[in-house]
Regions:
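Solvent-exposed alpha-helices and their adjacent loops that cap or buttress functional pockets
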Residues: 2, 59-63, 82
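Glycine-enriched alpha-helix->loop->beta-strand junction motifs that scaffold or abut catalytic
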Residues: 80-89
Length: 177
């Protein structure tokens, strides 16, 4: 089961993705529900106990373990993958190096007293095998990789504007304020 903050989907709808703190609360709920537990939903006086009502009655099956793979491109979301998830889905270079991402995952796992024995990590990367003599700006390369690259550029524009991150060095050659 893959789950993230909705960065791509929500931004496509003109909405911001879920913030990291509510995302952690959401992961706690999902993890508990998939374990068949009753979990507390809401805050303070508004909190209520919830659970799956129709589990095991032919509607859905949670008797088998359902692994959660957490989408995490920033350090705090990667730590949440270690705290609540069975795997991390990240991106390179946006999610940092694999070494950095795994250090963040370990931080979250340590915080929760979990081990990473069977933890699965995957990374979204752009890869293009060039034909002999083909250039990176060939029509084929642009057609195949352009949309994915531009989705990442749009993410960075939003992150610089909304969060205030510094423009990464690798994007500076095409960055125009």
């Amino acid at each position: 089961f893959g789950i993230g903050t909705g960065n791509t989907a929500m931004r496509t709808l003109g909405r911001p993705p879920m913030r990291v703190k509510p995302f952690g609360q959401y992961l706690r709920l999902v993890r508990g529900l998939l374990h068949g537990e009753e979990v507390s939903y809401g805050d303070g006086d508004q909190a209520t106990a919830i659970r799956f009502q129709w589990a095991g009655k032919g509607h859905y099956d949670i008797s088998e373990y359902i692994p959660i793979h957490v989408g995490g491109f920033g350090s705090r979301a990667q730590a949440l993958a270690g705290e609540f998830g069975d795997g991390l889905i990240t991106g390179i270079p946006r999610g940092g190096s694999v070494t950095q991402a795994l250090a963040n995952v370990k931080h979250g796992a340590d915080r929760a007293g979990r081990t990473l024995d069977d933890f699965y990590t995957s990374a979204l990367v752009n890869l293009m095998m060039l034909e002999p003599g083909e250039k990176l700006d060939s029509e084929r390369v642009i057609k195949e990789c352009g949309p994915s690259i531009m989705a990442n550029v749009h993410y960075l524009v939003d992150a610089v504007r909304d969060v205030g991150i510094e423009v990464p060095g690798y994007i500076l050659p095409i960055w125009d304020d």
